[in-house]
Amino acid sequence: MKKISLLLASLCALFLVACSNQKQADGKLNIVTTFYPVYEFTKQVAGDTANVELLIGAGTEPHEYEPSAKAVTKIQDADTFVYENENMETWVPKLLDTLDKKKVKTIKATGDMLLLPGGEEEEGDHDHGEEGHHHEFDPHVWLSPVRAIKLVEHIRDSLSADYPDKKETFEKNAAAYIEKLQALDKAYVEGLSQAKQKSFVTQHAAFNYLALDYGLKQVAISGLSPDAEPSAARLAELTEYVKKNKIAYIYSEENASQALANTLSKEAGVKTDVLNPLESLTEEDTKAGENYISIMEKNLKALKQTTDQEGPAIEPEKAEDTKTVQNGYFEDAAVKDRTLSDYAGNWQSVYPFLEDGTFDQVFDYKAKLTGKMTQAEYKAYYTKGYQTDVTKINITDNTMEFVQGGQSKKYTYKYVGKKILTYKKGNRGVRFLFEATDADAGQFKYVQFSDHNIAPVKAEHFHIFFGGTSQEALFEEMDNWPTYYPDNLSGQEIAQEMLAH
């Protein structure tokens, strides 16, 4: 028995050595990817240069996945690990802390792409105090063909930088696949640009980027599962909602059970269909030769069942309350005095990031979300708003230091009151007023802060107004509002934070 055990151990060792030698002999990279879109895009770019492995199979939610010890070892033994975004694979940041960065290269497929807040977002003009706060970001960018192209491009560029000897192959493979994605994008543009109904109702709120890029509106509903019938109370609510908005289809992420489809059809007069979020492919899909492009073509066909039918704009079941303090709606009695300590810290102007193009994605999002201005018009608007030559402001409990043209000027300040201003849209904002006690403060004699808050709280960013004439003169300034964020944030981090408002 002992001899048999030794023999088996020897054979296993020989097998492992053989596998290792084979890996070296074929010269291929070993790339581990997280879930299906990342796997597909990486495989298309790498081609025959790599063995690309999928970590998360069908039936497992990438958000909730926790890598086993075996999976961690697999990643640690890889040449490259590719994931989409930490907002999707929430377990990745912890994993990255354990990886040997010299041995395993990592690629974040979204790169410098900015993400939208995970919840609904109200957009509007920059009448200070109108924006809400969200801190979770939507990672489902792969469901928009035009953004899928950006993911492929970033994977291509990252692999090329890490393995320059294979750059030509990566570029050739990526170009061929991007051509197919461009054709898919064209099909979406042609299929949806003349949509008669621009709203679609889905049980899985994963299609925000698709809707945004192709002129549609995603309306998400809750309490509906493809596997089970809704409760009588929920069915009554759905029936009323469907009839009120004349909804023809409700989409789920997989085929609804026949019982659910029959119930919704009979009671609510609405049909069900699939919008596949493409987080995985089933074994049946794979055997049938399905892939990212073919599934996205099916999604387009499903969407057109709604968009080709005329109907009124579909409103969310529960309208979001936009008349909040953050959006500039409050009672006068709620406004409280604040001290300079609320703004204490080291701050940087955002104007340089606007000038170098870091905020261009922000303006593109705003243009698509609001439809009020083009990207170029938004950039011009914020250029005027952010413009300043004061690059940094360092604040203590009673002093402000302004860095201007490489020179520093520091003064002591006292709080002198607050002023409620009413904007054209009807919402309001509060400016908190400070005055320098130094006679030589010049253009920094009078200072006003606006940061979307109306009572004592630590500011996360602020707009500032300063001048040497009077506080009253500053009240008239509505077009130029130099804006500052903590100086330890990168331009990319600030841009992402802006989208969270």
Language-model segments: residues:
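Extracytoplasmic metal-acquisition and chelation regions
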Residues: 5, 19-334, 341-349, 436-443, ...
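Positively charged n-region of N-terminal signal peptides that target proteins for export
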Residues: 1-8
